[in-house]
């Protein structure tokens, strides 16, 4: 007896080899840079992109201390963290964070653009941010990215 409907087959997207990219953040606007980095971390630039499969790449960001913020965001934008104790809410302006920990500014911007689930944590582990123009990932031969 013949089947009235053909059997549907589902193809599974396999994880491909991860590529390494290096991005120079000097003179780039923070939000525009972070959205492009998030796209590469998730693998949305690949033709084999599938939302439930981790096909993302590694991204190394250099010169994080030379990133730009438009308008008055350097003085008006606040970053908060809480220690868990009463009176333990700490706040820094973007200027203070850029002076103390410039790599954390880009890290937080990209983190907030990634999914808030388990895959987002995997993506974030592949982000490497450095304040200077040198990084320890030369052995991976990262390809330069221009945005």
From Swiss-Prot:
Disulphide linkage map: none
InterPro entries documented for this protein: Ribosomal_uL13 (IPR005822), Ribosomal_uL13_bac-type (IPR005823), Ribosomal_uL13_sf (IPR036899)
GO CC list: cytosolic large ribosomal subunit
MF terms in GO: mRNA binding; structural constituent of ribosome
SUPFAM superfamilies: Ribosomal protein L13
Keywords, comma-separated and alphabetical: Ribonucleoprotein, Ribosomal protein
GO biological process entries: negative regulation of translation; translation
One Pfam family per UniProt: Ribosomal_L13
Description of how the protein assembles with itself and partners: Part of the 50S ribosomal subunit.
Function: This protein is one of the early assembly proteins of the 50S ribosomal subunit, although it is not seen to bind rRNA by itself. It is important during the early stages of 50S assembly.
Family statement drawn from the similarity comment of this UniProt entry: Belongs to the universal ribosomal protein uL13 family.
Protein's name according to its UniProt entry: Large ribosomal subunit protein uL13
Organism: Pseudothermotoga lettingae (strain ATCC BAA-301 / DSM 14385 / NBRC 107922 / TMO)
Gene name as annotated: rplM
């Amino acid at each position: 007896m013949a089947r009235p409907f053909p059997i549907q087959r589902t193809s599974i997207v396999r994880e491909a080899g991860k590529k390494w990219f290096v991005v120079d953040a000097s003179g780039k606007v923070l939000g525009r840079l972070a959205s492009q980095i998030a796209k590469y971390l998730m693998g949305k630039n690949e033709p084999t992109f599938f939302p439930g499969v981790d096909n993302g790449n590694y991204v190394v960001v250099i010169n994080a201390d030379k990133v730009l913020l438009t308008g008055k965001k350097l003085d008006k934008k606040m970053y908060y963290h809480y220690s868990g104790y009463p009176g333990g809410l700490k706040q820094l302006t973007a200027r203070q964070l850029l002076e103390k920990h410039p790599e954390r500014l880009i890290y937080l911007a990209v983190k907030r653009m990634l999914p808030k689930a388990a895959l987002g944590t995997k993506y974030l582990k592949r982000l490497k941010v450095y304040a200077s123009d040198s990084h320890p990932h030369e052995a991976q031969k990262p390809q330069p990215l221009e945005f």
